[in-house]
Structures are given as structure tokens and as C-alpha cells.
């Protein structure tokens, strides 16, 4: 039985932060760390003591993580950033409420002695001889210690305490991965049994030594099960210092989702029930398991369920049938065509998530060039007279302020200058739209046309498609490019306003111009002639989009997009593993990098032919590199294995921590199915005849730090996992099991007289009872399977580890 763990984290906003700049303000941003590893960084909000971020992350994690921390810092253009405060949430605190955490939490002061990380490897023995008892502590090594020196390393030594006695190991200079391999022996002194405490310290020539962490073992543990193995370092026990709100507060939302995923055969009955649902008629179907699942799902859970169901049916090659089933149900119960797909129904959410899962490479290809132009050119555009800054031109030139009419004309020209290429890219993208999306739109077009064939409703079939493609896909991506991975950072206020105007225009085009002049925003009127010109082109585009032959048989199952599709691309600095004769700063060369499901490729620019590529199947590890390795930040390594079994390392430097995390995540996901992954690697580099991390002199020395292949950011490129998706559906059904039982009881007690009075069909009621009973039976079987596997786990845990 596999286990999965993921954190949904939303950094909402801060309030009452202290001023760190001479201007009386701060430039705050937030770092999100899991077990001392940075997994995300928010955008910087300039000149604010009450910043709003609204950034959301899904982090897939190993099951043994311990702590989630938020650090709020003030960005400085010169020197180091100032730390404002932090919030620490233990795993236990997060899981205390199944709904997670959603609250304001006061920031606390960052205590250097509490900022510990890493592990120590020990072997302890209790010996007895003629002179009494003796404790032998074999201090082997430590890994991933906190950097305490300006060089990004430490000078660690261990100090062992037992009773009133203490001994120290030697000090190993300039490493976070020390190897001592020293045995310390302490004689038991008269008195009560004493605990064993091992402390790690960073030796400093000037000033006091810095604390690196400690472990402690009770006398009972020493006697019954002497410690042997790796142990997580902890800070000194102390009460959490409450700042009383003096450092401000942070509003966060955190939810931990942990699941035990059973073997595939356990979910087969549930899968068969769901697959059967999409095979039959849907217009009046209230009896299928899928219809019951939709009925049981509340609005706040609908999006997550829609995502899992779409992935589930994609994995079986039946996503089109699933969407068609929901579409038929939605269309059949819609009386007014103006309200079609306007609610957040399961059908609407499923189509929306389907587009995000299947169409993100397509979206990037269509919109990214123009979105990049908007960010880079930073043109001022405004049509609303109430928001126009007429004095802006006076501040940046000597020509004086523009009149309102001049500002409107200038802004209109700029807007149409961006909208034109956007519309051109969209209407010219028929051949690039994924076949699965085109087939889904074709089905949608046909179902709506069959339901509303009247002449006065001839636009409804177009509006149904454009409502998804334009209003729920293109327009939101233009409005918030970062959420669709089109940009690494949120837009500044001026660019954000420009994007809002463009998104409004694209929405109006998606509505086929039907609402132009009817809303409150009459200041958009100067743009209406251009928008109306685009409407006829969009109609023609939609006709060509749904003019596609074939069915789902031609769409590969268990894949969101072809293996050759580009998952991530951009400029990085690249360095080969081989020693370079040049200085380090010249060894990294600027390269354009593409990542697909098949290869990691490099060239000098996007227009050049690829000059080098690495098969993704050869990747064995993707990890961060310590800053001290090359005296450079944001470096990662890609470790590959050739046909002879030899390992090779490619180093890549990113612009910032967010770009680093995104590339790490993308590479780890792409290489997730690879066999023979490395359990450990070197976070340093082999330079000057030794590893910079652990100081070992052999290039072939075993890695000194654990790899983190399970730590990834959740996004549209997540691989399909049908068993995990089925587990989520099972969990959702569990929440509604009482309702299912009540429904079965009501249907069983309903007599034929009541059936006649209510107009209910006996055959429909019989199918409802059968479907409800089958669902409850499947849930009971899955309950038993989970209990059996948990009993097996408890049995294995009781036996204890078989080795060190």
C-alpha cells in the first residue's frame, strides 16, 4: 500500500508589520519552508505594512515531514534582507483539525538557537565490566546542518553529556556534512540514572560558539533499546516566545491531505461503477453512481472532485465520454439558455479542470508572447476617466499633461495593439489545440444545438464553447498570468490594470459582443468597434475548432499531453561536471533549456538548433546545490546515468528561488517513473580534489545528503495516478455515506401508492436502490481493505526494524 501526502498552502495577507526602512515602511515577502527547505517564495509587495499576497501552493511531500514554517522578510536592494518574523506549524498542529488551519497567527521573533536542521548518526552501547557500567557513544557523522558561517558552511563538533560528565569530538572545518567516526566512552557516576544528550556546535574563533542542534535519550531508552541510526536534531526545549503582535500577523490557510492508496485491484469495483455511469443515457439519469456522487458533493469540494474525476477518466481514455455525460445532464435540466453552464456545477468545473490539465501547453503557446510583451513594455493604459492619471506624462517628459481625450486615444491604440496579436494568435491556433479538447468542444456544440435548435438560439452553441475557452481559460490566464505559469511573479499595479483591461476585452469577445453597452462600464465604448470586428472571426474560429474527425480512440490514455510536449522552458546558466580551466564565473554559460516528457534539451537561444539533449529516462536525481559549491545562489544539479552505469552531473543556475523550485519540481515529475533513483547525492561540487560538501577526496564517494524526489509543487503537469484519484473519490463518498444510507432506506420504504402520487417511475426507483446499494457495498469493501492493510502495517511496526 502506497502513501501520499500533500500540503495545500495559501499565504493570504499580513497586517501591522513593523517598518524596516527609513521611509517608515517595508517591502515584505514570505518564504515557505518545509523542514528547512524553501519550497516557495511570494512576490514582494513594495512599501506596505499590510501586504496582500493571495498566493496558493500545493506541495507534494514525503510522509515523514515534521514542520511547516513561514518567514516574512523585508527585501533590500543593498545588503541582506531583514527578517521580520516567522510562524512555525508542526505536523501535529496542522492535522489537529481535518479542515486544516485558516486564521491570523502572530509572527514570532526568529531565535538563531531554534533555527536548527539536519540529522546525526549515532551508535550507543551500554557496557559492564568489573569497574561498573560504561556508555560507549560512537559519533559517526551528521548531515544537512544549518550554515552558521558567512561562507555558507559550519565548523561542527559534537559534545556528549551523560550525568555530570562530558566529552567532545574533534572539530571539522567548513562543512555541513561532517564525518567524525569517533568513539567516546563515559563511566557511570553514582546516583540516579541519567539521560544521554548529544549536542552539535559550530566552533568560532571569535565570540561564542553557535548551537547546531541536539538529541536526547532517556535512561529507559538507553537500557532497553540503545540508539543506533540517524536522528533528527532538535532545538533546546523552550517556550515559544510570543511577540504579542508587535511583529505583526500573517493570515494563512493550510491543509494536509494524507492518503493510504491501496493496490489497483482494490479500486476496480469502484472504477467499474463510475465507468458504467458514462455508458448509459444521462438526460434523465438520477440513478447512476456518478449522479449520486454529484448529488452528495458540496460546492466547496466540487473543484477538487472535478479534477480527480477528470484525471481518473483521462487515465482510462474516457474523459470525452465523462464530459459528454455531464454535459447532457446539465443541458437537459437547463430551461433558460442564458444560464447554461453559468453555475459552478460539476459539469462546469470538470470542463474547466479538463482544459487546464490538457490545454496548458496550448495556452502557453498562444498567450505567452503577448503577455511577456505587456510585462516588459510596461505601457500605461487607461480608459476609465475616474482612474486616469493625467499628470503622469508631465512627470516623465517635458511635453506637459495629456488631456483626457488624448489619454483615451493613446490607451485605445495601445490596447488594440495588444488585443490584435492576442486575437490573431487565438483564431490561428486551431491546428495547435489538443485533439482531446477539440473533441470535447465538438460534443458540447452538438448537445447544445440538439437542446436549443430554435433560430433565436443559434448563438447558444457558440456561447457554450466560448464561455469555457474564453471566459474560463484565456481571460483568467490574461488576468493572472502567474496562476497559469505564464510568469514567475505577479504583475505590479500598473501592469495588473493593463491585464485587467485586456481580460475584460477578451471576455467581451468571448460573449460574442452580446453584452456590449449593456453593463455599467460604458467607458469601454471606444473599444467596442474593434471588439465587434473580432466577433465574426471568433465564430469562424469556433466552427473550425469543432470541425474535427475521430473519437477518443485516437487520444492516448494515461497521458495529459504527448511525451514530446514542452513542460517547461527558459534561459538558465549551465555548467558541465568536468573541471573547467576557466574561473568559476566563466564556467556557467547561458543556454535556452526545454523540458519535455522525453528529453532535457539545450541550445544557445530558442531559434537555434538544439545542440545537446539528455534523455529524461537517464535522470537519477534532481537536487539543490549549496551556495558554497560555486559561490552562487539558486543552483541545482541533474544527475544522469549512461549506458555503462557511470554517473554524470549537469549544474543549472536559476534567476531566483521560485524559478529554482519550479524547475526542480518539473524535472522530478518528468523523471518520477525512472528506476534506480539515487537515495543520496552530494549537494556540493567536486573541486580541488575533494567534495565541497563533505570534504571526501574520492569523486566516486557515496552521496552525503538524502535526495528529495518526492518533494514537488502541484500544478497542471502532475502525472496521472488513477489509484490516487480513485482514493479521493472514495474519500468523498465516505463523507456522504450517511446520506446514501438514508436514501436507500427512504427508497426501500417507498410504496407503489407514493410512487403513483409523486409520478416516480418504479424502474427508476429500482435502479436508484440498486446503485445506492452497490455504492455502499463497494465502500464497505474498501473500508475492509484499508483496515487489513493497516493491521499489516501495525504488525510490521511491532516487529521493529530488521537492521540499522
Curated annotation (Swiss-Prot):
Ras-GAP domain residues: 317-545
UniProt-annotated binding residues for Zn(2+): 682, 693-694, 704
Keyword field contains Glycosyltransferase: no
Keywords: Calcium, Differentiation, GTPase activation, Metal-binding, Repeat, Zinc, Zinc-finger
Domain of life: Eukaryota
Binding site for Ca(2+) 4: 149, 202, 204, 210
Domain called C2: residue spans: 1-105, 116-231
Sites annotated Arginine finger: 342
Binding site residues for Ca(2+) 2: 21, 74, 76, 82
Domain named PH: residues: 565-672
Keyword Calcium on entry: yes
GO biological process, one term: intracellular signal transduction
Coiled-coil portions: none
Entry cofactors: Ca(2+)
InterPro entries: C2_dom, C2_domain_sf, PH-like_dom_sf, PH_domain, Ras_GTPase, RASAL_RasGAP, RasGAP_CS, RasGAP_dom
Sequence positions that bind Ca(2+) 3: 149, 155, 202, 204
Summary of the tissues where the protein is detected: Highly expressed in thyroid and adrenal medulla, lower expression in brain, spinal cord and trachea. Expressed in melanocytes.
Recorded GO MF terms: GTPase activator activity; phospholipid binding; zinc ion binding
UniProt cross-references to PROSITE patterns, sorted A to Z: C2, PH_DOMAIN, RAS_GTPASE_ACTIV_1, RAS_GTPASE_ACTIV_2, ZF_BTK
One Pfam family named in its UniProt record: PH
Renumbered zinc finger spans (Btk-type): 674-710
Cellular compartments per GO CC: cytosol
Amino acids binding Ca(2+) 1: 21, 27, 74, 76
Function in brief: Probable inhibitory regulator of the Ras-cyclic AMP pathway. Plays a role in dendrite formation by melanocytes.
PANTHER family hit by this protein: RAS GTPASE-ACTIVATING PROTEINS (PTHR10194), RASGAP-ACTIVATING-LIKE PROTEIN 1 (PTHR10194:SF3)
Protein known as: RasGAP-activating-like protein 1
Provenance organism: Homo sapiens (Human)
Gene this protein is translated from: RASAL1
Amino acid at each position: 500500500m502506497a502513501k501520499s501526502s500533500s500540503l495545500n498552502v495559501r499565504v493570504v495577507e499580513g497586517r501591522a508589520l513593523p517598518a524596516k526602512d527609513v521611509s517608515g515602511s517595508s517591502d515584505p515577502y514570505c518564504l515557505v519552508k518545509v523542514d528547512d527547505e524553501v519550497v516557495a517564495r511570494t512576490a514582494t509587495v513594495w512599501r506596505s505594512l499590510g501586504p496582500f499576497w493571495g498566493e496558493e501552493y500545493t506541495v507534494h511531500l514525503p510522509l515523514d515531514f515534521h514542520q511547516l514554517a513561514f518567514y516574512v522578510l523585508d527585501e533590500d536592494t543593498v545588503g541582506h534582507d531583514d527578517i521580520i518574523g516567522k510562524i512555525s506549524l508542526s505536523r501535529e498542529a496542522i492535522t489537529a483539525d481535518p479542515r486544516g488551519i485558516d486564521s491570523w497567527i502572530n509572527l514570532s521573533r526568529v531565535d538563531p538557537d531554534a533555527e536548527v536542521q539536519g540529522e546525526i548518526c549515532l551508535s550507543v552501547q551500554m557496557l559492564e565490566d568489573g569497574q561498573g557500567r560504561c556508555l560507549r557513544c560512537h559519533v559517526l557523522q551528521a548531515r544537512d546542518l544549518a550554515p552558521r558561517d558567512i561562507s555558507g558552511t559550519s565548523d561542527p563538533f559534537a559534545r556528549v553529556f551523560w550525568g555530570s560528565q562530558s566529552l567532545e569530538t574533534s572539530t571539522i572545518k567548513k562543512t555541513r556534512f561532517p564525518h567524525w567516526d569517533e568513539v567516546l566512552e563515559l563511566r557511570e557516576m553514582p546516583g540516579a540514572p541519567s539521560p544521554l544528550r548529544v549536542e552539535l556546535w559550530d566552533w568560532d574563533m571569535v565570540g561564542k560558539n553557535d548551537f547546531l542542534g541536539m538529541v536526547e535519550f532517556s535512561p529507559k531508552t538507553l537500557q532497553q533499546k540503545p540508539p543506533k541510526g540517524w536522528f533528527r536534531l532538535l532545538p533546546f526545549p523552550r517556550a515559544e516566545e510570543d511577540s504579542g503582535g508587535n511583529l505583526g500577523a500573517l493570515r494563512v490557510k493550510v491543509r494536509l491531505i494524507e492518503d493510504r492508496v491501496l493496490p489497483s485491484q482494490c479500486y476496480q469495483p469502484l472504477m467499474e461503477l463510475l465507468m458504467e455511469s458514462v455508458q448509459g443515457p444521462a438526460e434523465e439519469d438520477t440513478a447512476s453512481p456518478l449522479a449520486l456522487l454529484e448529488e452528495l458533493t458540496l460546492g466547496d469540494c466540487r473543484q477538487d472532485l472535478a479534477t480527480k474525476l477528470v484525471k481518473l477518466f483521462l487515465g482510462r481514455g474516457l474523459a470525452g465520454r465523462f464530459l459528454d455525460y455531464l454535459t447532457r445532464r446539465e443541458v437537459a435540466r437547463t430551461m433558460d439558455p442564458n444560464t447554461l453552464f453559468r453555475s459552478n456545477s460539476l459539469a462546469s468545473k470538470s470542463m474547466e479542470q479538463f482544459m487546464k490539465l490538457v490545454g496548458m501547453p496550448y495556452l502557453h503557446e498562444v498567450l505567452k508572447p503577448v503577455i511577456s510583451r505587456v510585462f516588459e513594455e510596461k505601457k500605461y493604459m487607461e480608459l476609465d476617466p475616474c482612474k486616469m492619471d493625467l499628470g503622469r506624462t508631465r512627470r516623465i517628459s517635458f511635453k506637459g499633461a495629456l488631456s483626457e481625450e488624448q489619454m483615451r486615444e493613446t490607451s485605445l491604440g495601445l490596447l488594440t495593439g495588444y488585443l490584435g496579436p492576442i486575437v490573431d494568435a487565438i483564431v490561428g491556433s486551431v491546428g495547435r489545440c489538443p485533439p482531446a479538447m477539440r473533441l470535447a468542444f465538438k460534443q458540447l456544440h452538438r448537445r447544445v444545438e440538439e437542446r436549443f435548435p430554435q433560430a433565436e438560439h443559434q448563438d447558444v452553441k457558440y456561447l457554450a464553447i466560448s464561455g469555457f475557452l474564453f471566459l474560463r481559460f484565456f481571460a483568467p490566464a490574461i488576468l493572472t498570468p502567474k496562476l497559469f505559469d505564464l510568469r514567475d511573479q505577479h504583475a505590479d499595479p500598473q501592469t495588473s490594470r493593463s491585464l485587467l483591461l485586456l481580460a475584460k476585452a477578451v471576455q467581451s469577445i468571448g460573449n460574442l459582443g452580446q453584452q456590449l453597452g449593456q453593463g455599467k462600464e460604458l467607458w469601454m465604448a471606444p473599444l467596442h468597434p474593434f471588439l465587434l470586428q473580432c466577433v465574426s472571426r471568433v465564430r469562424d474560429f469556433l466552427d473550425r475548432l469543432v470541425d474535427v474527425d475521430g473519437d477518443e480512440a485516437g487520444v492516448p490514455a494515461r497521458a495529459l499531453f504527448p511525451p514530446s510536449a514542452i513542460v517547461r522552458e527558459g534561459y538558465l546558466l549551465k555548467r558541465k561536471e568536468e573541471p573547467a580551466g576557466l574561473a568559476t564565473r566563466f564556467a556557467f554559460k547561458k543556454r535556452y533549456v526545454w523540458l519535455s516528457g522525453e528529453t532535457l534539451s539545450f541550445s544557445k537561444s530558442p531559434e537555434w538548433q538544439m545542440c545537446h539533449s539528455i534523455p529524461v529516462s537517464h535522470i537519477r536525481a534532481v537536487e539543490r546545490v549549496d551556495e558554497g559549491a560555486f559561490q552562487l545562489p539558486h543552483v541545482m544539479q541533474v544527475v544522469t546515468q549512461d549506458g555503462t552505469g557511470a554517473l554524470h552531473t549537469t549544474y543549472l543556475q536559476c534567476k531566483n528561488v521560485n524559478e529554482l523550485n519550479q524547475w526542480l519540481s518539473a524535472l522530478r515529475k518528468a523523471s518520477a517513473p525512472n528506476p534506480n533513483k539515487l537515495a543520496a547525492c552530494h549537494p556540493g561540487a567536486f573541486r580541488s580534489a575533494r567534495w565541497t560538501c563533505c570534504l571526501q577526496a574520492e569523486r566516486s564517494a557515496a552521496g552525503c545528503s538524502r535526495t528529495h524526489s518526492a518533494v514537488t509543487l502541484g500544478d497542471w503537469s502532475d502525472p496521472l495516478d488513477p489509484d490516487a484519484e480513485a482514493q479521493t473519490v472514495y474519500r468523498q463518498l465516505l463523507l456522504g455515506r450517511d446520506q446514501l444510507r438514508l436514501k436507500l432506506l427512504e427508497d426501500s420504504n417507498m410504496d407503489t401508492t407514493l410512487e403513483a402520487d409523486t409520478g416516480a417511475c418504479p424502474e427508476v426507483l429500482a435502479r436508484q436502490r440498486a446503485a445506492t446499494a452497490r455504492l455502499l457495498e463497494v465502500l464497505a469493501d474498501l473500508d475492509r481493505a484499508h483496515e487489513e492493510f493497516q493491521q499489516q502495517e501495525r504488525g510490521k511496526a511491532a516487529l521493529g526494524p530488521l537492521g540499522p
